[in-house]
């Protein structure tokens, strides 16, 4: 989808990711259902003694929200390796919690923008899962580094193809847009058209398309409604 993304005064707040206990959940929005055992299998953790010998292996249940996210990722892209799908799901939960966003909303954006194709490149050059333009990605990476007291990032457009990096930048970007426009619908429109374009049209009382925001919000609502049935 074509974009004209521009710089925004993105700012973020820091809060730790927090997940709840395990619930069994099957995958959605695909003809084939994933087995409950497969998507909710507990994580094995091994305790070691001081000399490095294994003492005991304990099972830790996967958090409910993590299983939800994983089920969506695998339903859209069943060929993704399980380890990669879990990692993508973990990053979505971590960054959504950090920026006070619903992980299902981030999943909806990824579905509409790239259908979970981490190497997707649009005709205008937007890249990765959340389809970020390289110039916007460079600005966001530098902004994140400054907030952490680090030197400017060594950014390359190809770095947007990394799923974890792309999700971090895209979630940070949406958080900044929501703070700027004080409205989720406008934030989504700005994510698609660019904040400068949206602000200009608002100031000049000009119309702009809300099609992207409508599609994302419809997908988001479908995720919420479908997941509550399990």
Where are these regions (language model features)?
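Hydrophobic membrane-insertion alpha-helices, especially the h-region
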Residues: 18-34
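N-terminal Lys/Arg-rich, disordered targeting/topogenic segments
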Residues: 1-14
